[in-house]
């Protein structure tokens, strides 16, 4: 019990020295906040919202872009323009650097990288299946690892296509599952190598 109390005290002392969490520089900018508030008030209710819905491309609707999201996106670039005009560094918004949408991809380069990584993983999975006999001791463990990894790349692609609270959590949870499964895979491999499993 005493060791647990000491650990809690150490954790509290360490946490007390941490600075308070703040929003990104761009989020705190009065110009950005006013722009978003005015845009949402003028465009995201009543007849203006209906007009937005009629003009919104199908691919943007399918990926969940709402009027308020569009306001944030446009105001982000208006604020970035002011920063550049004044000779300041471009700030982050909502914990991310400004991004250019392409079609329905919120972060096209990151989404493309995730797709390519997933594709490489899929190709290697098929090569592994073709080269390694099913009876091999690590076969199912390695196939499972490939499936966990493929799932992580799918969620990474989804997250970089459209950043929402759900897609962000799924991206991070699935990436963490790859790390955890890697540790498991190493332990199983070590056990088999030393014949202790």
How would you name each of these model-derived features?
Residues 3-197:
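Multi-pass alpha-helical transmembrane bundles in non-GPCR membrane proteins
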């Amino acid at each position: 019990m005493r060791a647990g109390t000491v650990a809690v005290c150490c954790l509290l002392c360490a946490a007390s020295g941490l600075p308070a969490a703040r929003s990104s520089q761009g989020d705190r900018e009065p110009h950005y906040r006013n722009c978003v508030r005015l845009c949402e008030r003028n465009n995201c209710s009543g007849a203006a919202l209906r007009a937005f819905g009629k003009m919104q491309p199908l691919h943007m609707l399918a990926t969940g872009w709402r009027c308020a999201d569009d306001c944030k996106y446009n105001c982000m670039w208006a604020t970035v323009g002011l920063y550049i005009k004044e000779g300041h560094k471009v700030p982050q918004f909502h914990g991310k650097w400004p991004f250019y949408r392409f079609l329905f991809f919120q972060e096209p380069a990151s989404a493309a990288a995730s797709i390519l990584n997933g594709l490489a993983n899929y190709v290697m999975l098929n090569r592994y299946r073709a080269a390694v006999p099913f009876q091999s001791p690590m076969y199912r463990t390695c196939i499972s690892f490939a499936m966990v990894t493929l799932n992580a790349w799918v969620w990474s692609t989804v997250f970089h296509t459209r950043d929402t609270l759900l897609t962000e959590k799924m991206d991070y949870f699935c990436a963490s599952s790859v790390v955890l499964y890697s540790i498991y895979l190493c332990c199983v491999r070590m056990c088999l190598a030393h014949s202790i499993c």
